[in-house]
């Protein structure tokens, strides 16, 4: 394990252990003999998440059920990263089971849900004090991860969970990455579009500083109810983030100078000039953050609104997770994560070795050995399989950009519109349906739209295309001009 500072280790591990663990005998039993599933918490990018009770101890847990034929090697990577993390600011991993065609991942249960759930339940963004308290815990979690040379790569309000003690924890390591000594920076496009750092989008290589940019966007999301650019199509946002100045508050004067400065420190275009998580923990805005009691009061307010029927969420008990209609709790599914995966082939022997080290019980399902449903996703090869020159694993690691089943771009998270904070973003829903239609060729839904609306959308589409062309031309000239200048200089010298 890479070394980390003593202070960060103390900050991350103080009060961490909850005393619960799964022993080898429990891992060797069928999961239904060990747990009672008591309710569904939500749907995520890899599968569904459920609330469960450990039969022997009564301990409340969260279980993520993942179809094995989706992306097994990526799930193994997620488990590996979770298992290595021992911080009270990172969701704890206890063990996993194979059950039929699913992998059950047993994790710490966070009874108050995500920050996104809280905002939806209260139908309003967070206050400045609430935001600073959430950011303090999140920064401690990021400091811990970054000390271990790990990048989360998907920081957003939907991936910050709260327990009922008012402690914020980082969750969803499905796209997290490890920085090794031989790979100082990654260059894969991965994350959620609106929260992506410019260097991630441009694929020029990135490191832990990418998480800091995403944290700054998340701070704006918590303050305004939605991230910057969420009112436009994600593809346009991906184009604009690297070319436009760093985003700021819509009304900076409504927030303290300390908060404005914190956002500025996070959202610096050049990653080398961005502060680290450790340095941001020393920022005045974070140092003056209130205690957990502020977040406990926020959670209580959200739960009261649920119980009074003032929020579009379901509640299953005093410590129930806040559930939004059509939205996930453990993993926010409303704003899909953009991922490019390698087509890794894994032998059953290597997978079994990983399973043993990661506390995974049960037998590898047959579906893990590849099927027509894999559609190019990483899969496991049966025992005895050896790589050959014709193996796809020997081909270039990524498909052409924007192609393949793992290229996912979703619409923005349910937005808060006007004073009423409408929970349905009709523009986003239209764009979502339109993008699906582009893929499957079924544009039948357009028949239900009025002529005036169709004309309006066509005119809007034309203007958007013209603006994107102008942006592309400006970007092209910016790249082309230095080359022309150097050519001219060389001609003069000759």
Swiss-Prot record:
GO terms for molecular function: ATP binding; protein serine kinase activity; protein serine/threonine kinase activity. Residues 369-378 have a biased composition (Polar residues). Residues 1-27, 364-413 are annotated as: Disordered. CDD domains: SARAH_MST_Hpo, STKc_MST1_2. The record marks 332-333 as: Cleavage. It is an enzyme of class 2 (transferase). Its cofactor is Mg(2+). The active site is at residue 154. Proteolytically cleaved by caspase-3 during apoptosis which results in kinase activation. The keyword ATP-binding applies. It catalyses: L-seryl-[protein] + ATP = O-phospho-L-seryl-[protein] + ADP + H(+); L-threonyl-[protein] + ATP = O-phospho-L-threonyl-[protein] + ADP + H(+). Its EC number is 2.7.11.1. InterPro entries: Kinase-like_dom_sf, Mst1_2_SARAH_domain, p53_tetramer_sf, Prot_kinase_dom, Protein_kinase_ATP_BS, SARAH_dom, STE20/SPS1-PAK. One of its GO terms (biological process) is determination of adult lifespan. GO terms for cellular component: cytoplasm. Serine/threonine-protein kinase which extends lifespan and delays tissue aging, probably by activating daf-16. Belongs to the protein kinase superfamily. STE Ser/Thr protein kinase family. STE20 subfamily. This is Serine/threonine-protein kinase cst-1. It comes from Caenorhabditis briggsae. The lineage of its organism: Eukaryota, Metazoa, Ecdysozoa, Nematoda, Chromadorea. The gene is cst-1.
């Amino acid at each position: 394990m890479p070394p980390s500072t003593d202070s960060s280790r103390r900050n991350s591990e103080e009060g961490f252990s909850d005393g619960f663990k799964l022993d080898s005998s429990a891992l060797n039993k069928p999961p239904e003999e060990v747990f009672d599933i008591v309710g569904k918490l939500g749907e995520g990018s890899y599968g569904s998440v459920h609330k469960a009770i450990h039969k022997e101890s009564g301990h409340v847990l969260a279980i993520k059920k993942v179809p094995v034929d989706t992306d097994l090697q990526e799930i193994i990577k997620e488990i590996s990263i979770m298992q290595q993390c021992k911080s009270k600011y990172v969701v704890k991993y206890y063990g996993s089971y194979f059950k039929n065609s699913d992998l059950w991942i047993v994790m710490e249960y966070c009874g108050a849900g995500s920050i996104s759930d809280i905002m939806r339940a209260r139908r309003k963004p967070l206050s400045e004090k609430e935001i600073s308290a959430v950011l303090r815990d999140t920064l401690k979690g990021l400091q811990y991860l970054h000390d271990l040379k790990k990048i989360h790569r998907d920081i957003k309000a939907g991936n910050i969970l709260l327990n009922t003690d008012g402690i914020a924890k980082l969750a969803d390591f499905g796209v997290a990455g490890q920085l090794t000594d031989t790979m100082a920076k990654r260059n894969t496009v991965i994350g959620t579009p609106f929260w992506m750092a410019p260097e991630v989008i441009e694929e020029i290589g990135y490191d832990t500083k990418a998480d800091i940019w995403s944290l700054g966007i998340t701070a704006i999301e918590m303050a305004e109810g939605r991230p910057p650019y969420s009112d436009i199509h994600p593809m346009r946002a991906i184009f604009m983030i690297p070319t436009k100045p760093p985003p700021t508050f819509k009304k900076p004067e409504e927030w303290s100078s300390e908060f404005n400065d914190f956002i500025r420190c996070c959202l610096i275009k050049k990653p080398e000039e961005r502060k680290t998580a450790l340095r941001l923990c020393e920022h005045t805005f974070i140092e003056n953050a209130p205690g957990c009691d502020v977040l406990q009061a926020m959670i209580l307010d959200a739960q009261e609104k649920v119980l009074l029927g003032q929020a579009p969420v379901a509640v299953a008990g005093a410590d129930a997770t806040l559930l939004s209609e059509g939205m996930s709790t453990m993993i926010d599914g409303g704003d899909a994560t953009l991922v490019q995966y390698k087509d890794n082939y894994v032998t059953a022997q290597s997978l079994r070795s990983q399973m043993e080290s990661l506390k995974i019980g049960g037998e590898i399902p047959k579906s893990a050995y590849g099927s027509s449903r894999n559609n190019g996703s990483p899969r496991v090869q049966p025992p005895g399989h050896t790589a050959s020159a014709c193996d796809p694993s020997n081909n270039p690691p990524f498909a052409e950009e924007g192609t393949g089943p793992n290229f996912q771009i979703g619409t923005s998270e349910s937005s808060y519109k006007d004073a009423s904070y409408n929970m349905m973003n009709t523009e986003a829903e239209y764009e979502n349906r339109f993008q699906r239609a582009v893929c499957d060729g079924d544009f039948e839904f357009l028949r239900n739209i009025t002529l005036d609306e169709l004309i309006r959308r066509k005119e809007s589409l034309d203007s958007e295309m013209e603006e994107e062309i102008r942006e592309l031309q400006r970007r092209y000239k910016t790249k082309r001009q230095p080359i022309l200048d150097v050519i001219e200089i060389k001609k003069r010298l000759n």
